[in-house]
């Protein structure tokens, strides 16, 4: 049941982009079309989950035993950069159209604070490996969900007349704020589930 709570909390209650405001750059930059958003969500899910597994192992089996915790951020960034390079090579071969659509935002996953933030957060929360994987995958799903919903809204906005003063960045920011407010409606759900299943 603990895994279900982690899953629901990471997707809805503590959504990485809409309530913790990590990963805003790709959220705003790759959300013009749903198909691009799906591709970016998939790339983030792959990198985030795999990076969390590897960084957890690096922390537990290299940094902690040798007292090298001060190298955590540097080590995690190197792992994430290597994974992003791997994803970039795979996408270039498998789906050149998606690779072109993601453009500069694919290499920017390396510096995406959401990926690094999740890797560090699982260490801070002292999750075991399975909890870390569930948390990372759930966080990636939450990011993808927010990105796809936002892209769908932006596609619909392109079909309607928007007042001149609200065009461009203004309507994007207002829409992102409203989406964030909508996700705030899930706050307290994890606490309710904890009390329902007697996990408090």
Q: Where are these predicted regions, by residue range?
A:
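Helix-coil boundary and interhelical linker segments in multi-pass alpha-helical membrane proteins
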Residues: 1-5, 57-70, 120-131
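Structural signature of hydrophobic alpha-helical transmembrane segments
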Residues: 3-18, 67-82, 134-146
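Hydrophobic core segments of alpha-helical transmembrane domains in multi-pass membrane transport
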Residues: 6, 13, 44, 49, ...
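Generic transmembrane alpha-helix signature in multi-pass membrane proteins
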Residues: 21-29, 88-94, 104-106, 113-126
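C-terminal ends of transmembrane helices
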Residues: 22-36, 84-98, 150-161
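Cytoplasmic-side transmembrane-helix entry/capping segments in multi-pass membrane proteins
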Residues: 35-46, 70-76, 98-109, 163-170
């Amino acid at each position: 049941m603990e895994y279900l709570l982690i899953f629901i909390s990471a997707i809805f209650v503590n959504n990485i982009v809409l309530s913790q405001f990590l990963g805003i750059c790709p959220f705003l930059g790759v959300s013009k079309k749903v198909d691009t958003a799906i591709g970016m969500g998939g790339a983030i899910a792959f990198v985030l989950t795999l990076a969390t597994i590897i960084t957890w192992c690096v922390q537990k089996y290299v940094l902690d035993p040798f007292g090298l915790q001060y190298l955590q951020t540097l080590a995690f960034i190197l792992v994430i950069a290597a994974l992003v390079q791997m994803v970039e090579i795979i996408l270039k071969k498998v789906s050149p159209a998606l690779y072109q659509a993601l453009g500069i935002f694919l290499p920017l996953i390396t510096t995406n604070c959401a990926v690094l933030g999740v890797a560090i957060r699982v260490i801070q929360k002292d999750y075991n490996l399975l909890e870390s994987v569930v948390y990372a995958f759930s966080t990636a799903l939450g990011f993808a969900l927010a990105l796809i919903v936002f892209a769908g809204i932006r596609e619909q906005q392109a079909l309607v007349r928007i007042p001149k003063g609200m065009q461009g960045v203004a309507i994007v920011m207002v829409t992102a704020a409203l989406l964030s407010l909508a996700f705030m409606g899930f706050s307290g759900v994890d606490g309710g589930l904890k009390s329902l299943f007697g996990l408090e």
